[in-house]
Structure formats: structure tokens, C-alpha cells
Amino acid sequence: MDAYTVDGNAVSLPIYVAGYIALYDMGDGGELTLTRETVAAALPPASRLPINIDHRNGCVVGEVLSIVDDARGPFFLGIINCPQLGAVLATAAGPDFFGELSEGLSEQERLLYLVSNYLPSASLSSRRLGPDEEPDETLFAHVSLCVIGRRVGTIVTYDATPENAVAPFKRLSPSSREELLITAREAQSRLGDAATWHLSEDTLTRVLLSTAVNNMLLRNRWNLVARRRREAGIEGHTYLQASASFGITNGCNKADFCGAELVDTCGYKSGEKVHGAPYSRVTLGAKAFTSSSPNALPSSDNDKGGIGERTQKHISAMASSNPQTLSAAGAPLVSGDYILVPAAQYNQLVVGQHTSHPPINAGPAPVTHAVPSQYIPPAYNSLMPPSMYQAPPYWSVPHSANLEAQITALVGALAADRKATKGSDPHVIQGSQCSPPLSPQQERRYARKRRHDWDATTRDDLEGIYYPGERSPRPGERRAGRPSTTIADLMGAVSSLQQEVSQLRAIQTVTAQPQAAPAGLYKPIPAVPPQYSQYQYIQPQHAVSAIVAPQLPGIPSQPTQAVLAPQVPAGEAPGSAKVVAASTAPQQAEQARAAPQQFEAVTSAAVLPVTQPQASSQTVDASASTGLEFGRDDADIFVSQMMSAR
């Protein structure tokens, strides 16, 4: 239902939801683009905006209290009070979902954990404008809770109070935050504290199930959620936990704030102020450390987990035996401090470290590294005795490299941090019982090594099709389709026909080329009578090629007869040539009259329709491109043509 109802007997569990419904200039294209002018024209909305689930108009669970136009994008704050929502989610959750906190959590806190991890995003529904229509106060239709919103940065936070719901958004301007809270209090006073939105459990169950089904194929859901959280600037949200294993706390105590990425310095949960910490406080194990100074080191309690032991072991291993080599100002360093050495300057530092020592070949080699006399080449003519033979540089005694030892310890500490922060490692999970968040020093340190995944990839890569168990497709890569047998057969037939046509054209070209021999080159054989000697050499230019028509099945092929013109032998009288020409003229005329009749008969036979097989009603008719056999064989036709031509 769209309107709220007041029911004093219902179990009221009001919670508040807040977040950006869009971000300006973040790559949203098409109809998803919201400009500052459009949002300014649409605010304030003409009517109250409902909050539903998965854009279902019949599944309204709350209402938007306030929307402000922040510098980064429109930001909303709403209230959710649907008793059936908490009941359905609590029934669906397993007994181990809340872990050790199951005994001490209230019903409202259970609802916050469930809805935060099931519906972490919001989606704004706006009215589609016409070609010449301008936006107005009726542009916004409703706000929907969903798994992943299509717009950038549309991750929401849920909490028990409006102030706590807005607190994790660190990039929200103070003026927008104050205006949002004031407007929300006024709207809530008009609604009343007992405002609830009732739904049937069957309807709510179907909607929640459809939300899960429609997002089953979403690739890297929690990676995408984490990316959207960074885009929205959320820090310190307790209830949204992308845990790699089952359970909210993953074996940690409630006081550890396990799962909170960054806790605000003012401690919006406890109200305690951490002095001297201008940025944030990060939990590690059971003890929080501040990032007030860039040289401050994170301290950990070694009794609370394996992460503190490994971190303390690697940090203590980096203590320098020669602190003066690391101090630029000459002041001694505190035990346990370390520095980051860029890879580009590593070689220069190593060379500078070696130049402070005497040259390797300044004196004779030590006795332990002297080369025995039997290993010296016999033809070696040295100006000094064999005992004074200088050893190569790599045979000298290695000196102590304090800088290299410290860099090695630093690399070991970085490797241990990466292993400790990798939540998917079962050994780390068993040893530490929870995966602590990254400190600001660690974030800056990792940022120098590589870019974040959400910066290196585009949004289109995350929204593409993927297949479980296979590698993710690269940008611009397309899955190759299965080759069609019919298309392959057709391509083979076309290639064969092209080859046949090329061969036929080559034969005609060779036959049509004139090849004349010099007069008197070929003389008649003496054993042959003179009247037959004219056939010993036939010049190709006097041969008439017969037209070879395609032979169809059922039509007998007739041998091709070439009409040969007689050749006049060299030295013979012109009168005899006239007699031979006169005797062959009637034969040429008779064959010339017979050739058109034969060609017309073959041509008329070629245009006769080929009988097609009748389709049977009991079988499935294949398409014409499948290449079914119709009683003709192209190979036989080709062979008959070639044999008749020969």
C-alpha cells in the first residue's frame, strides 16, 4: 500500500536509511544521467516519495523524509517501518548468521544487520520526460531498495537514528548534513512516531525472493558493493559487513567492532572523542590505533590474535643496527621505525652504501679466499708472487649491508600484511579469527604499488556476462560462437565451385591462345603418303573449340568433335591446296549445321525444372540451407564435364 497506517498493536521497528541517489559527473549515461539543473528543478518534490523494494509499487516499506542537493549529488534520508520485513528476514536467516552476537542483539539490531547485507543499495525512479518536456517537481517517482543500483555510488546505510545513518558519509558537506536533518525532523513530526507500512508476508516473501533470483548472476557482488562504498565516501558503517565466511562477527567480540572498516574520530556509536586523531581510527584485533602522525606505528595486542604476533615480529625484525644510515637529519630513530624506499632510488642507495667502504681490490685477498697454486694457469705471467695474486671481486668477503637487511625486513612485513588482510585465506581466518581493515598507512602504501581494482576496470567490465568457473572476459572480448555445420558445408561447396570455374577458365584461356610454328619447321614423315602428311602438325589457331554444355543426369553426353582445318605443306602447289579445301568444305558445313541443333537440345534440357522431393508430414522439414540430398551429385557432373572436354 502507498499510504501509511497507524496500528498500535503492531511491533514497531523503525530504522532510517540514507545515501546518495546519484552522483554528478561520474559516468552515468543515457536516461540515468542527472544533471545539477535537473535536480534543482525537481526539488523539492511535489508529493511524498515512497520507499519500496525492487521497484514494486505494491511493496512499500517506508517513505523519504528529506532530499538535499549536495555538491556531489542528491542525497536522501528516509524511514522504514514495516513489521513484516523484520519477521520475514529473521525467519530466513540461519542460526549461525549472527555468530556470538546472537544473544545480545535486539530485534532492531538484527533487522539492521539483515537489511544492510541483503539490500545495500538504492535506486531512484524518475518519470521519463518527453522530447520537449522540462523537468519539474513531479520528476521523482519513488526510491527503491535493491541489491545493486545502476547509478554510481548509490550505496545506502541503515541505522537506528537519523544522525547515525548520515554519519558514515564523510564527503557530505556540513551544510547539506544540517539541512537534511532539520528537514527530516519536520517531516517525521508530520508523520508521527507510530507510522507503519504493513504488508502481507506472502507478498513480501515473493518480492525478496525475486530480488535474490534476479541478482543471482551478478558477478563479484561484494567487490562491486565495496567499490560503490568508496565512490560514495562511506566510512565507519557497522552493519554492512562483506564477510568471506558465515557469521556477522566471525569469532570476534562485540567490543572489537569487527567488520567496521573505519570508525570516526568522534565515535558516532559511543560518543567518545579521540584527541589528536584528525582523520580516523582503525580497529586491529582488540585495540584501536590512531593515524594522527604519519610516523606513528600501529600497535597491537599480541594476546588477541595471530595478526598482532606476525605484525610485531616483522616490525621488530626491521630494527636497524646502524640507525645513522637511515636518518637524514642525524637524529636517532625509535626502535621499530622503518621507511619506504622507492624502487627507482634503490640502486642509488645501494651504490652509496658500498662507496663508504674501502675498495675491494685495495689489498691482497684474505688467506681464506686465496687461490691455490694448482688452480693458477701455468702460462700466467704475473709480476707478483702467487701469494699476492688478486682475487676477482666476487671472491671478497661480503660486508654487512644494513640497508639491504632493513629493506628485506620491510618486504617481509608487506607480504605478511597482504596475507593477513586477505579474507579468503583459510589459514589467516583460522589464525586471526577476523580480517582487520587496512590502516591509512597501509592504504597509502598499497596505493603506491598498484591501482585499485575499481579504478583499473570500467563499469562495463563489471556489468558484462560471466560464467562461473571460467576466467572473466577481457575488455572487447567476445565469446566465439559454435561453428555451424551447414555454413561450413556451404562454404566448402562455394569454394569447390570457384575452383572448378577457375580451372575451366584456365582451360579456355590456354586453348584460345595462338601458338604458331614457323613454316617448314615440321616436315612430313617420308613413310607417310603425301596426301596424309598435312595432318602431322595441327596448328592451334585452325582448331575450333566446341562448346561444352553442362551435362545433367539422364542426358547422354556426346563426344566433342573439333573441326580441323587442313594445313598446306610447304613447297606444295597452290592448286592442291584448293582441292583439299574444296573436299573439306562440305564436311564443315554439315558439322556447322549440326552444332547449333545439338547446343539447342542441351540448352533446352538444362532449363527443365528439377523435381523436388515431396515433404512428409511426419518429419520435420529442414531449411533450404541444410543441404539435403536431392538426387544430384556435383562431383559426377564435374567429372563428366572434364571427361567430355578431354
From Swiss-Prot:
It comes from Equine herpesvirus 1 (strain Ab4p). One of its GO terms (biological process) is nuclear capsid assembly. Residues 336-355 are annotated as: Interaction with pAP. Keywords: Host cytoplasm, Host nucleus, Hydrolase, Phosphoprotein, Protease, Serine protease, Viral capsid assembly, Viral release from host cell. One of its GO terms (cellular component) is host cell cytoplasm. InterPro entries: Herpes_virus_sf, Peptidase_S21. GO terms for molecular function: identical protein binding; serine-type endopeptidase activity. The gene is 35. It is an enzyme of class 3 (hydrolase). Pfam families: Peptidase_S21. This is Capsid scaffolding protein. Belongs to the herpesviridae capsid scaffolding protein family.
